[in-house]
C-alpha cells in the first residue's frame, strides 16, 4: 500500500467535495477546481476527511494511488488557501512591469518580453520592502491551481534563467545558483 496514498486528506469546514463518478469537484472560498481521476482509484468522503482507495493491487493502480491522493490534497489546499510563488529578478537594468494583466519583462534583449497569464492566475510586482508596485524586481505568481502556478512561474523564469558567472537572470525566491569562476580566475 502506498504510504502517501493511504493517508486521509482533512477537509476544512469551508470546503465542499462533489463526487460524480470519476469526476471530483472541490469548492472553497478561493474558487472551484475539478479533475477526472483514473478508473484505478476511488475517491470516498468519510466524515470530515477524504480517502483515496485503489480498486485492486494491479501495477497501474499502485502507481497512481499516491499521485491521485496528492493531486486531491493540492486541490483542497488550493481552494482554501491558494498557492503563491515568488520570482526574483537580478541584474543591472532588469525589471518587470505590469500593464493591465500582462507582465512586461525588460531583460536585456532588444525587445521587451510580454507574458499573458492564463485564466485563474494573478501576477503582482513587489519592491524590496514588500509593497505592491507597478514596476520592480520581485514577481508574485498566485492562483488556486498548483500546477498552473508552477507552469506560469517556469515560463517567466525561462525568459532569462540565472547564469552561473554573474548570477544575473530570473530565479525563484531562495533558489541557490551555483557560481562558476570565469576564465581569468583559472590561470
Swiss-Prot record:
The terms describing its cellular component in GO are:
cytosolic large ribosomal subunit
Alphabetized GO MF terms = rRNA binding; structural constituent of ribosome
Q: Does the keyword Disulfide bond apply?
A: no
Q: Does the keyword Ribosomal protein apply?
A: yes
Report the function annotation for this chain.
This protein binds to the 23S rRNA, and is important in its secondary structure. It is located near the subunit interface in the base of the L7/L12 stalk, and near the tRNA binding site of the peptidyltransferase center.
User: Known InterPro entries for this protein?
Assistant: Ribosomal_uL6-like, Ribosomal_uL6-like_a/b-dom_sf, Ribosomal_uL6_a/b-dom, Ribosomal_uL6_bac-type, Ribosomal_uL6_CS
- Keyword terms: Ribonucleoprotein, Ribosomal protein, RNA-binding, rRNA-binding
Specify the domain of life of the species encoding this protein. Answer: Bacteria
- What is an annotated GO biological process for this record, any one? cytoplasmic translation
- HAMAP family named among the record's database cross-references: Ribosomal_uL6_B
Subunit composition? Part of the 50S ribosomal subunit.
Please name the SUPFAM superfamilies in this protein's record.
Ribosomal protein L6
Q: What is this protein called?
A: Large ribosomal subunit protein uL6
Q: Which organism is it from?
A: Thermosynechococcus vestitus (strain NIES-2133 / IAM M-273 / BP-1)
Q: Which family does it belong to?
A: Belongs to the universal ribosomal protein uL6 family.
Amino acid at each position: 500500500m502506498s504510504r502517501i496514498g493511504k493517508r486521509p486528506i482533512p477537509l476544512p469546514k469551508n470546503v465542499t467535495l462533489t463526487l460524480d463518478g470519476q469526476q471530483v469537484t472541490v469548492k472553497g472560498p478561493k474558487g472551484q477546481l475539478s479533475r477526472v481521476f483514473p478508473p484505478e482509484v476511488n475517491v470516498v468522503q468519510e466524515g470530515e476527511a477524504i480517502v483515496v482507495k485503489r480498486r485492486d493491487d494491479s501495477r497501474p493502480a499502485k502507481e497512481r494511488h499516491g499521485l491521485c491522493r496528492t493531486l486531491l490534497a493540492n486541490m483542497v489546499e488550493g481552494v482554501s488557501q491558494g498557492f503563491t510563488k515568488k520570482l526574483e529578478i537580478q541584474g543591472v537594468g532588469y525589471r518587470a512591469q505590469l500593464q493591465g494583466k500582462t507582465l512586461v519583462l525588460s531583460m536585456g534583449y532588444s525587445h521587451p518580453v510580454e507574458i499573458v497569464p492564463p485564466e485563474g492566475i494573478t501576477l503582482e510586482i513587489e519592491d524590496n520592502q514588500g509593497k505592491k508596485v507597478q514596476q520592480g524586481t520581485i514577481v508574485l505568481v498566485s492562483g488556486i491551481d498548483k500546477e498552473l502556478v508552477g507552469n506560469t512561474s517556469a515560463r517567466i523564469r525561462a525568459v532569462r534563467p540565472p547564469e552561473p558567472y554573474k548570477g544575473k537572470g530570473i530565479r525563484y525566491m531562495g533558489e541557490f545558483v551555483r557560481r562558476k569562476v570565469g576564465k581569468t580566475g583559472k590561470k
